[in-house]
């Protein structure tokens, strides 16, 4: 059963108050957009840095060579490697990370594992800032709380804003940042209502419908 509320703050307060699972539930968001998901030009995708982070360590792998190897290690990458790492993954090594970064001079060398990375949504992409010569800056940005988003086949964007241990104020800051970036990525061809509905919930909790989206962005 969905509970309706005009106030994002009230939604979040109720979610945190009613959370009853014996683990640290995440706070999830589902944004239903007024797009035609069958049209490629109306797909909405991008990245956003949540100002208060996501409440967990974001794992990053860097594929590169030369001086960038040491740069990536110093910047805190969880996995760093070159062609040897590519071959290990090709042979079945599991890659338990949230993001993959590569440098322009190495992008061609990850071709053998492009399908593996692509299937997990990890393929480096200049649009996401994950194919770059500034490896240290990319790692810093991602680990500060950067997440990816994209519309699914129903025109809905799913994401995480943090967890139930976050303060309501911090969750509101993340919510505002998330919705602002989605708004800035509105396709030119979309007419009429863009934000059809926004739902918030904890992992095991009820969904709360948030209205007056435009008021907070």
From Swiss-Prot:
InterPro entries: Ribosom_uL1_bac-type, Ribosomal_uL1, Ribosomal_uL1-like, Ribosomal_uL1/biogenesis, Ribosomal_uL1_3-a/b-sand. Keywords: Repressor, Ribonucleoprotein, Ribosomal protein, RNA-binding, rRNA-binding, Translation regulation, tRNA-binding. One of its GO terms (cellular component) is large ribosomal subunit. One of its GO terms (molecular function) is rRNA binding. One of its GO terms (biological process) is translation. The keyword Transport does not apply. It comes from the Bacteria. Part of the 50S ribosomal subunit. Binds directly to 23S rRNA. The L1 stalk is quite mobile in the ribosome, and is involved in E site tRNA release. HAMAP family: Ribosomal_uL1_B. Belongs to the universal ribosomal protein uL1 family. This is Large ribosomal subunit protein uL1. It comes from Wolbachia sp. subsp. Brugia malayi (strain TRS).
């Amino acid at each position: 059963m969905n509970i309706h509320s005009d106030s994002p703050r009230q939604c979040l307060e109720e979610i945190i108050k009613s959370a009853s699972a014996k683990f640290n539930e995440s706070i999830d968001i589902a944004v239903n957009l007024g797009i035609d998901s069958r049209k490629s030009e109306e797909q909405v995708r991008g990245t956003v840095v949540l100002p208060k982070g996501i409440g967990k360590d974001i794992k990053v792998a860097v594929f590169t060579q030369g001086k960038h190897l040491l740069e990536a290690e110093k910047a805190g990458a969880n996995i760093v490697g070159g062609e040897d790492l590519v071959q290990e993954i090709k042979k079945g090594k599991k890659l338990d990370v949230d993001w993959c970064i590569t440098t322009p001079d190495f992008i061609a060398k990850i071709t053998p594992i492009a399908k593996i990375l692509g299937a997990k949504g990890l393929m480096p992409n200049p649009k996401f800032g994950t194919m770059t010569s500034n490896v240290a800056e990319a790692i810093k940005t991602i680990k500060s709380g950067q997440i990816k988003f994209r519309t699914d086949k129903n025109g809905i964007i799913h994401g995480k804003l943090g967890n139930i241990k976050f303060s309501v104020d911090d969750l509101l800051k993340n919510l505002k940042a998330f919705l602002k970036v989605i708004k800035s990525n509105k396709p030119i061809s979309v007419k009429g209502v863009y934000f059809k509905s926004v739902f918030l919930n904890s992992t095991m909790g009820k969904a709360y419908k948030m209205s007056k989206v435009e008021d907070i962005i």
